[in-house]
């Protein structure tokens, strides 16, 4: 069934390209060969790191409005073909205008989006979600994005709990600057989750560009809504470009658990890179883990 959906999406994209310039077909394939030790011995594996395929675009309406849309799936070219090979990612229908934009469907929460590009090992083994809660892509959600005012913008995500026993959730974030540090040298954000996937979470994020270095930091406190157990942690990251290469490192803590990562990316072209990284985790109540990987990524 999932394969049929993807084939239909490709067919629709091919047909629609002739009629609407607003449609964009895009994707990313990221694969690593890695040596992994998850506490019970070392082994070798091939992994797809959130490779994806999607369609997105907008269509102009009357009165300064436009309809926006995105349909995105995660694919796994390293795994055997089965029903788990395709997974839904952000998929929504929206309406945009001078008021901002409203999106309805499955979408990254405001707190998740607020971290910008600070997590330098996003989608890899050292993704911040290993130690932290809050990296939620929520279904049954309504998201509102404000226009930018003097560099400030905000996002609010309302999560509908479709059962009498559940509590609706709210995720909100206030951002300043450019999260890619392309149009400004500063990015900062403050975000809050209430009753989102069983946690109340506060996250503060910041990143600056100084003398070529990208320096990032995050602080988070999270509390389980079922057990009231509260935990705190922080993250620091640094990246430095050297010609076609970029060196990067990151350290993350959540209470007594911590992780360290170091890596290098090397551009082979505008949309293609090779890379290598090492990540190590020290857990207080679980087996320690470490990974060494080399990989290739291409975007289209």
Segments (PLM) and residue ranges:
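Outer-membrane beta-barrel proteins
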Residues: 1-300
């Amino acid at each position: 069934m999932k394969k049929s959906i993807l084939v239909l999406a490709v067919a629709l994209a091919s047909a629609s390209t002739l009629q609407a310039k607003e449609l964009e077909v895009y994707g990313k394939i990221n694969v690593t060969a890695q040596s992994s030790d998850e506490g019970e011995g070392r082994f070798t594996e091939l992994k797809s790191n959130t490779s994806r395929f999607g369609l997105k675009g907008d269509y102009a309406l009357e009165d300064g409005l436009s309809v926006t849309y995105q349909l995105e799936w995660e694919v796994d070219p390293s795994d055997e073909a089965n029903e788990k090979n395709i997974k839904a990612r952000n998929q929504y229908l929206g309406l945009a205008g001078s008021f901002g934009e409203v999106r309805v469907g499955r979408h990254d929460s405001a707190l998740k989006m607020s971290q910008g590009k600070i997590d330098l090992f996003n989608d890899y083994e050292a993704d911040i979600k290993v130690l932290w809660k809050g990296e939620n892509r929520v279904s049954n959600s309504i998201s509102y994005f404000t226009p930018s005012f003097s560099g400030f913008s905000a996002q609010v995500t309302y999560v509908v709990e479709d059962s009498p026993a559940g509590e609706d959730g709210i995720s909100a974030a206030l951002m300043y600057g450019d999260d890619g540090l392309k149009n400004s040298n500063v990015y900062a954000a403050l975000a809050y989750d209430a009753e989102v996937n069983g946690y109340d979470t506060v996250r503060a994020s910041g990143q600056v560009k100084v003398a070529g270095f990208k320096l990032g930091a995050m602080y988070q406190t999270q509390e389980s809504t079922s057990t009231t157990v509260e935990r705190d942690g922080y993250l620091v990251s640094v990246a430095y470009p050297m010609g076609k290469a970029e060196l990067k490192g990151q350290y993350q803590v959540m209470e007594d658990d911590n992780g360290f990562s170091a890596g290098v990316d090397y551009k082979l072209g505008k949309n293609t890179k090779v890379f290598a990284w090492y990540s190590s985790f020290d857990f207080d109540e679980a087996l320690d883990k470490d990974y060494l990987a080399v990989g290739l990524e291409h975007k289209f």
